[in-house]
Every structure is written in C-alpha cells, then in structure tokens.
C-alpha cells in the first residue's frame, strides 16, 4: 500500500468485527515493524504484552478498562499493552542528557506505536489506542514489573464500521518557516 494512502486510511476504530481473528504471524509482523522505530541512543526500551484469546481480551477489558473503552474495543481480536522498560535519556553516570530525561522512553514508545498501528493497517487490521485505563489493574493482570512504565493499550482487529476521516489542521496551521 502506498504510504500516503496508508496514512489517510488509518482511523481509530471503535467497533470491531468479533468474527474475524488475528494470526500469530500478523502480530509478529506488526511488532517487527514497530522494532524498526528509532530510539534514544538505540536504547530500544519498548516492550509489548499481547492478550490473544477472546477470553483473555474480555477478562482484561473488564478488569483494566473503563466502561467506555470496554465498549469501544468490544470485538477486538487482541489487546496489546506497550511499556517502557528501564530508562532512556540518561548518561552512564545516571544524569539526564537533557531536560527531557526519561521522557525519551515515552517518546520512543510513541514512535514504536506509530509503526505498530501503520503496519497493522497495511495488513488490513485496525487499531484503537486507549490512554485511559487502570494501570494498577494492568500491572496485576499481566504481572508487569515496576521498572516498566505503561504507555499505551491498543485494541487490534478488523473494523465493523468505516468512520469518516476526522478534520485535520492544515500545514499552515502548524508550520512556521523561517
């Protein structure tokens, strides 16, 4: 698929087809694309935990997501959580390289997730990134260690609807040339 078309087609989907499934090979292809994202000093701190059976997805959603995200992700074939493991943006002696400090881990996670969702779309899958979730419940449900910081929860599956493209700002709205 042409890259520009891919960017234009990708949407946050809030209605998934529960009859369609995602294969292990598709999940691996998506994560392989995510791995290609750049990271601070090549630290590669992003980690994923994937719930791949309908029963686990349903149980996770009920325990870890607010009601509106449970509804929005219903029917998704899988749910993936993205974490930042350890720290990035620091020198070997532990001082921050700049004012962003460990924020680089989240920045890198965002780059990873962008690759993740675009590759999913290229494979014909759809996604919904959910930022509102119960971090404590997720840690308990997936036995996540304290040195991993939750960044995103992503529902993955096949769209049951085709939503309109949301209005975007223009280049003139966001770009200043000097």
What are these model-derived regions, one by one?
Residues 13, 36-37:
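Helix-loop element at the rim of GNAT/NAT acetyltransferase active sites that forms part
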Residues 13-29:
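A short N-terminal beta-strand-loop micro-motif at the entrance of redox/enzyme domains
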Residues 26, 39-109:
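Glycine/small-residue-rich phosphate/adenosyl-binding loop
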Residues 43-46, 125, 151:
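Short secondary-structure junction motifs
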């Amino acid at each position: 698929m042409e890259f520009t078309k891919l960017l234009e087609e990708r949407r946050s989907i809030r209605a998934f087809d529960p009859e369609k499934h995602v294969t292990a090979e598709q999940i691996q292809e998506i994560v392989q694309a995510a791995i290609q994202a750049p990271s601070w000093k090549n630290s590669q701190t992003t980690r994923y935990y994937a719930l791949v059976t309908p029963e686990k997805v349903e149980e996770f959603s009920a325990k870890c997501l607010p009601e509106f995200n449970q509804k929005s992700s219903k029917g998704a074939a899988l749910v993936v959580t993205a974490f930042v493991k350890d720290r990035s943006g620091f020198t070997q002696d532990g001082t921050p390289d700049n004012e962003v400090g460990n924020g680089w881990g989240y920045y890198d996670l965002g780059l990873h997730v962008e690759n993740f969702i675009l590759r999913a779309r290229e494979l014909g899958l759809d996604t919904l990134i959910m930022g509102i979730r119960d971090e404590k419940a997720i840690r308990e449900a997936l036995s996540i260690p304290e040195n991993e910081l939750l960044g995103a929860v992503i529902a993955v599956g096949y769209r049951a609807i085709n939503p309109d493209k949301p209005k975007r700002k223009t280049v003139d709205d966001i770009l200043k040339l000097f």
